[in-house]
């Protein structure tokens, strides 16, 4: 059983949904990044979604773009990323670790080599932000060979054929977008995506996590009410890092408290 399967089975047994925070690796510095991610775990995160810093993160809004910039400006290297991932894996042997990455970063290392290095660092899944489902199969095939789960994005306007394709190829979980556009906590999540979720379930897809615009406990409750298995929050988490760049202790305390409040909203009645 994979870490994701164990995680979702445990949540189901406890009648809970998943809360998954997102941060950029190396933000604000490689050293502080470790403290940040440990705070997310200590706050009760069910899984982690971690971004590899990239100079042109087209799927992300201003908040996460600035996080990418901070990580790169602080000198975060690929070596640092592997070290951070290994330290987090040692800190929490069971938590599922997902990566959000842009294709250029994979090509730069060589596709097979990239996945192998991530597997060795303790990563469970990889989502490629800028590769459409149709073109992602070759990445997914290599990932599967190596033992990494390939996560796919299901957009809100996905056709039935695309949803079936996603259900077939996707592993770990499906990242379901609550709306189109770029990430951001200011843009509220749109109407519940229950129709899409039902279609994915019927097609045999892995669990669905709803993302984009998830910044308050009631957003988590709405995601679960729509039938999602959990919710991902990125910009709202990164905002707490940005707010306390000069105060590491406050940063950690705020992150822990935020995750705790979001996790509390995952309890199903």
Curated annotation (Swiss-Prot):
The UniProt entry, under PANTHER family, shows:
TRYPTOPHAN SYNTHASE ALPHA CHAIN, CHLOROPLASTIC (PTHR43406:SF1), TRYPTOPHAN SYNTHASE, ALPHA CHAIN (PTHR43406)
Q: Does the keyword Nuclease apply?
A: no
Q: What class of enzyme is it?
A: lyase
- What is the name of this protein? Tryptophan synthase alpha chain
Q: What SUPFAM superfamilies does the entry give?
A: Ribulose-phoshate binding barrel (SSF51366)
Q: In which pathway does it act?
A: Amino-acid biosynthesis; L-tryptophan biosynthesis; L-tryptophan from chorismate: step 5/5
Q: Which family does it belong to?
A: Belongs to the TrpA family.
- Swiss-Prot/TrEMBL catalytic activity: (1S,2R)-1-C-(indol-3-yl)glycerol 3-phosphate + L-serine = D-glyceraldehyde 3-phosphate + L-tryptophan + H2O
Provide the gene name from the record.
Answer: trpA
Q: Name one GO cellular component term.
A: cytosol
